[in-house]
Swiss-Prot record:
Its EC number is 3.4.19.12. It comes from Drosophila sechellia (Fruit fly). This is Ubiquitin carboxyl-terminal hydrolase 36. Residues 22-45, 102-145, 464-512, 554-853, 941-1005, 1022-1059 are annotated as: Disordered. Pfam families: UCH. Residues 703-720 have a biased composition (Basic and acidic residues). InterPro entries: Papain-like_cys_pep_sf, Peptidase_C19, Peptidase_C19_UCH, USP_CS, USP_dom.
Amino acid sequence: MPVSMAVCETANVVNAALRESLGGNSSAGSSTDQAKSGEDTNGSLQNHIVANAKRILMAKIEYEEVPNYHESVLENLKSKYIVIKPGNPGAINGFSGKNNTGKLVGANGHDNNGARKQAEHPNNQSHHNHPHPTSNPNELPKPKRVLYPRENIRIGWKQSERKWQVGTGMINVGNTCYLNSTLQALLHIPALANWLVSEQAHLADCNVAEPGSGCIICAMAKTLLATQSNQSAVRPFLIYSKLKQICKHMVVGRQEDAHEFLRFLVEAMERAYLMRFRNYKELDQLVKETTPLGQIFGGYLRSEVRCLSCNHVSITFQHFQDLLLDIRKADSLEDAFEGHFSRERLEDMGYKCEGCKKKLKRFSMIGNKLTKQISFKPRIDLSKYAARSPAAQAQPLTYRLVSMVTHLGASQHCGHYTAIGSTDTGSFYNFDDSYVRPITMQNVCNTNAYIMFFELDLSQAASPPANRPNGVRLTNGHSTTPVPAATVSSPSPTRFIGPQLPPGGANGYTNGNAQKTAIQFKQQNQQNGLQLGTGKFQDTAKPPLVGAYAKGEATSAPTANGNKSSSPSSNSSSNHKSINQQQYLPISSDDEDIDDEMKPGPTTAQLPSMPNMTEDNTEPKAKSPVKIHLKTPVKTPLKSLVPYESASEEEEAPLPNPRQSPGGEDFSESDQESGQTNGHSKTNGSLTNGSASSSVHVNNSKQKTDAIDEIFKSLKKSADSEEDDDEEEPSIQLTNGWHPQKQSQSQSKAPPSPKTPPSPAVIKSKTGIWKVTRKDEVDAIDDDDDAVVVEGAPVKIPTPNKTHRNPFSSSKPSTDSPATPGAKRQKLLNGSALKSHQQPRVGNGYQSNVTSNGSTVNELLKQSYRGYGASVLSWNGKPAELEKEPFELVCAKRIAGHGSVEGSDIVEGSVAVDAAVTSSSNSNDVVVIAVALLVDAREQRQRDLDDDEENEMDRGRQRKVKSGSAKGNNASNSTPGYNPFQEYEGQKRWNKNGGGGGFSRFYNQNYRQNFQQRNKFKFNRFGGAGSAKFQQQRALQRHLSAGGGFSRRQPSAQQQQQT
């Protein structure tokens, strides 16, 4: 045992020697005395003590055993001596001007750099409150007494012998969703639940059942046992009845804040635990923070503030039980932690310095709810924010999500609270008052989180908690850290597409004059300084990396969705690809079962490439060493939109195989696009490697020219080839580029003959293939002149299979017939012309099956717009052509443009131009066909008008009622406004009283007369229900509601037979 020497008679001698030495040193005013160093002062004191050594040695000495030499002797001696005036301003109590670390310490208590703070003066008031002053400002003060040892906290569900259940719901007794959700979140924290069930001795002696008395801890324990034992939802009346005891200003039945209730509930439980001790009011704050609630939820924040004016450094420790994170500038929980623990520059009037007397204002009140979604992971690593010893920094500090409180609602004044809690099996459940249902981890991470509870993950620790050499308290070893954060739910985080930027430097702090905050942990057996970790986020299963990233070392960078992508070194297996060219590739939903590697690299971020617009059903070759499994592609022919960059292929001979390059090697458009764009593309729903190092075979002999020059060249060549040839094969010309032809993979055609007019130029660019066509003459203004201009002999015009009823329905053209010399051109009044068709282009691998006048847009612009509500003009703001042209002219145009009645092509040698205009020997047949089409078109139009009149839209102008009478011969006999269905339902008698049954009166047709009798003054205003004036007005209203205009007179049956 350590021993101490009790000085009895020589105490006065020693005191006198000290006073004489100090008094002589202070009274000496010469320059030599002022120049004495600390060594001279110590030597003078030693000489005075040696002079009295004989008396001290001959004095009687008594010994006694003490438990601790430091506490019993040294502390008592320090309290007896007072420094009057030290010779050296930097020397205190005989210590030299060097501190424990060997750095020079100035008079103001910090070293020359102002980085560290010297020990407090022994006469300071804080020294008397804490009998164990520490010379290291980075170390927490040690409490005198520990109310609840940290080792008694059991973390995890499996640390208890009890079999934990999921737990039942809690009944909402009136705006108590905040109370139910907070209790569910607290009771699903394993450390708190294990402590509550361990209070069996106190629970037996507590009078919690009495109203208005008893501790809140026992009420929480009984509520926990009730949720574990019952099969149905419980009513938390033990907590609800003590609402006033928990917080005085909370009103029963009123909506309250869940976080506010959480704070008051934890404080009430702490007060209930402190009331078990007799002198709890005399305990200091450090002792009060060692309660079980403080050991589970508590921690310390170490703040270091440096004044830019006087360079004064202030280090403070602040106790916390939850972290309030600001998410206004954060997109994830990690970003919120970065912002909370990062350095910041305090503006003017931002901090109250001891010398400047300035104040700090850190928080601002916002009157609205933060409707911002942040992403979080089920595990977080706080190693970089923990101020621990170097030995403890090697151990990971990982916390796992155990429960949370969510808020549903757009405002902070109203809404609904729910809770999510974990079980011993690792699954999560959603607690919505009395409803309990399981929830997946993905939905948990996408939940609207308001308060989040994380508990230390012991599986990530390197050694058991009991065997740790340093006594770490609170958040570094055996406690939970609640992290409240107000968020709003949003769609699930999408996967990051594009290259990943390299991680930053090892030191995340760049501002030198700022405030630094870190989580502090108490050390019991060590007094060395603690350091603040500045590393980046690391994987929870690996220790954090120290220092900067080494060259060629495998590093990791987190992505937005939490999936870590590795970047291998230059000597890895993928040595065929440069590291600087590795990029992320887009992931398709069709290939979720394929394990793909995503390779980040230190390249700059680029926009994703345009999708491949010319995909065929051949499987592209992967030009990268990465093995990619491609599924069977589906043929999706598409066309490009805008040719940003183009290359000329006009003078290049068509290839026999559209998939074969001039070099003799097959390649796909997706490969070419992948090698020229930002390095990734999606082909048929499968993942292709599009790195810049992929070898793509491109014809190097192509001369790249401007797209505008190509367009003018194609227009010029099309103009030169307008003259007719004797032998022409019908083909289909691409006009708008929106109707590709379905062509098989193995299809190959010979190059076109020299007599065939060249097809329009095909421009191949990165965005796809463009075919440029030439528009004919400017559209002429439509008038009532001749419909057709006939030139030369008639030609075979291949038109799609269309009918006069539906001019937009089309099919494949019929079998070609031999062309006859002397082509006939037809120019209609609307400006569209039917030109001789050319040989299809086979070099680009697709064709079109639409004609020049068969454009869907052109047809839509000519249609009438009746029936679309109020009377409107056409899409371009002008009246429709059908409304301003004669009906016969419109029919003639349709006859000439869309073929015969049967939908087949017009026979050779005859062209229908009008009912009275022909130029062929078969004029009688043409007239018969034209007149038949004209009559049929008139009948169809009359039927359309009748349908419009029957099914006219009300447009809000006229009240519609159902009519039981059919329109026909007996339409005039119907009663206006009469609805038999409504009359039947209105006069129905449900009681079966009477002789003939329950509904006998409705079968004798008496209700029509009753309706007329009741409404005779309502509808008989014009001399009777069926008067001519009334019928004319009704017809006029129907006509005006249909859009106005007058329908043409329908031909009689005799006229139709004559025609």
